[in-house]
């Protein structure tokens, strides 16, 4: 089995990402990881105000380019890289919290993103129904963080039961209880933003090489989670 990061942000994808792809590749190699999923924030405020590209497709191209850059540098260390999202349905935000609800999405492809622009304009239910048709998994990240809104369990495949962000109060134990109560998939992620932030993920078989294989493994197997600082969250 190999270690796989499920929640990772890069510099250039948002205001909060601080590490460049070259740094990310070296740090994950040093930590013994053989796979990562790049899950930069995918939200209206970033696409409308942070990204400088003019058209929606140009913005998607830029978003994908961040993943490709991580893939380039990780390839030098033999680390597999998958494309993901941390998607914020804009309708779930509040005047005091944005993003108030985010979903880690696995199995997305470049063609899917180009063919389905402005995903953040859809409701949770609309997203779930669209993803079901396209073999994409949708799991709420850090659902019990203090400012977050809990999504409808009927319209998600799972939740992030361990979020390793070092400065947030994630109440991960509540996420575990929620997943068990609603028979949802539970995953773990570091929520990596900067150097020193690696402490989560899952174990994968060595032969998982495509996004399709990643999704099917998560769907059909009991996952072994990486939770380095579980007692502190």
Q: Which sequence ranges carry the predicted segments?
A:
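Extended substrate/RNA-proximal surfaces in nucleic-acid metabolism proteins
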Residues: 42-165, 213-227
């Amino acid at each position: 089995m190999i270690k796989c990061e499920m929640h990772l942000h890069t510099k250039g994808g948002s205001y909060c990402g601080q590490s460049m792809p070259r740094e990310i590749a070296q740090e994950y190699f040093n930590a013994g990881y053989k796979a990562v999923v790049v899950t930069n924030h995918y939200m209206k405020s970033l696409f409308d105000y942070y990204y400088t590209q003019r058209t929606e497709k140009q913005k998607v191209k830029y978003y994908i380019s961040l993943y490709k850059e991580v893939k380039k540098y990780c390839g030098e260390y033999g680390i597999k890289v998958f494309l993901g999202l941390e998607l914020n349905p804009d309708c779930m935000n509040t005047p005091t919290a944005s993003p108030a609800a985010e979903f880690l999405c696995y199995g997305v492809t470049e063609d899917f993103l180009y063919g389905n622009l402005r995903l953040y304009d859809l409701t949770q239910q609309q997203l779930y129904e669209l993803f079901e048709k396209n073999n994409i998994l949708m799991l709420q990240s850090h659902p019990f963080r203090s400012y977050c809104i809990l999504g409808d369990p009927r319209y998600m495949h799972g939740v992030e039961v361990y979020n390793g962000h070092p400065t947030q109060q994630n109440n991960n134990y509540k996420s575990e209880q929620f997943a068990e109560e609603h028979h949802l998939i539970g995953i773990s992620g570091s929520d990596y933003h900067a150097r020193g932030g690696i402490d989560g993920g899952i174990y994968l078989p060595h032969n998982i090489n495509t996004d399709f294989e990643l999704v099917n493994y998560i769907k059909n197997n009991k996952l072994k989670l990486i939770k380095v600082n579980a007692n502190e969250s």
